Amino acid sequence: MSAYRFEGYWKDVGTLDSLWDANMDMLAQGSGLNLLDKDWPIYARAESEPPAYLGETAEVDHSVVTRGSEVEGAVRNSVLSQRCTVAEGAEVEYSILMPGAVVERGARVAYAILGENVRVGENARVGASPEAAPPEEWGITVVGPEAQIEAGRTLKANRMLNREGKETVR
């Protein structure tokens, strides 16, 4: 057995909450993660995708938006994987969107993790800020891959939705 004294950033991301925490750490000042540090390169496979597109109505603040994504709405304190879409009038806050996730016009996603190819319909609501729910009822909202959230639907804080549309409390 051997040991190595490690002094950099490390986080076990074995739970959904710790995955969300690690992504938010990436956005936080002083977390030890600096994506622009040339001495700490990030190696990723190169895919043939266009760069991210930020439209005239886009508002992006303190977020990471990766290649192939299109943003016309507002994205704050969030991480968007490749090929995500945030339509005009949509809002995404404190959330992680996996590849191919779509947030349609007027929808709001807050404190959530959206799986691959999730579609959030027009004017739907997913998740909520910690202030919007009693502490014992609040938590990150998780939407499984391929799930479709109908227009106008509300998925409260601390809920999980699978691809078949079954909702459970986390």
Describe each region flagged by the PLM.
Residues M1-R170:
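Left-handed beta-helix
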